[in-house]
Regions:
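Charge-rich, low-complexity segments
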Residues: 1-72
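Long beta-strand-rich cores associated with HINT superfamily self-processing modules
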Residues: 68, 81-173
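Short amphipathic alpha-helical segments
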Residues: 73-77
Length: 173
């Protein structure tokens, strides 16, 4: 697929990530302004790279015409909390919002992955306004603590990015 076509596909997702980052960072600002405890420590967002999208489509055998329906994490936002109890609070805040709807939830806190990965994932439907009109798309929101984020970053690198020979005792974890 040509570069210009990829840009046009990913542009609304970039907008969604920027908007979601602003909205969740606003919660932090609002808590500070009102001198109340904030369950959100940090917000980060990203749009999946073209190579990562293609790799996922190949791995899951997703045809190009189904990409936007089946690759749910083209847009991603990670919300970092200080404490595990904050995760439920943040999920509840998101569930109550009128500007996004929850499509699905995956609770890797109750159902820890074999690798030790722990996090709370929401797939949301979110609408952005583009020059061509409104576009409803999907985004993944990951909610986790700083400690969980540290482990998840290492686990992700070992699973998807690391190209060397992994020691057997590390692969088993």
């Amino acid at each position: 697929m040509e570069i210009q076509l990829w840009r046009s596909i990913l542009c609304p997702y970039e907008l969604a990530v920027r908007e979601l980052e602003v909205k969740f960072n606003h919660i932090i600002d609002e808590c500070k302004e009102n001198d109340i405890y904030c369950p959100i420590e940090q917000v980060e967002g990203r749009v999946k790279s073209v190579s990562s999208i293609l790799e996922k489509m190949q791995r899951k055998q997703i045809p190009m015409e189904r990409m936007e329906e089946e690759v749910e994490d083209i847009a991603g936002v990670r919300i970092i909390c200080q404490f595990e109890e904050d995760i439920e609070t943040v999920a509840s805040l998101i569930q109550k919002r009128s500007d996004m709807t929850i499509k699905s939830e995956k609770n890797y806190l109750k159902h820890i992955k074999q690798s030790g990965y722990r996090s709370y994932h929401l797939i949301i439907h979110y609408t952005v306004d583009t020059v061509k009109g409104p576009k409803k798309l999907q985004a993944e929101i990951q909610i986790r603590t700083m400690a969980m984020n540290f482990w998840a970053t290492i686990e992700h690198s070992l699973q998807y990015k690391y190209k060397g020979d992994m020691p057997e005792h590390v692969a088993e974890r």
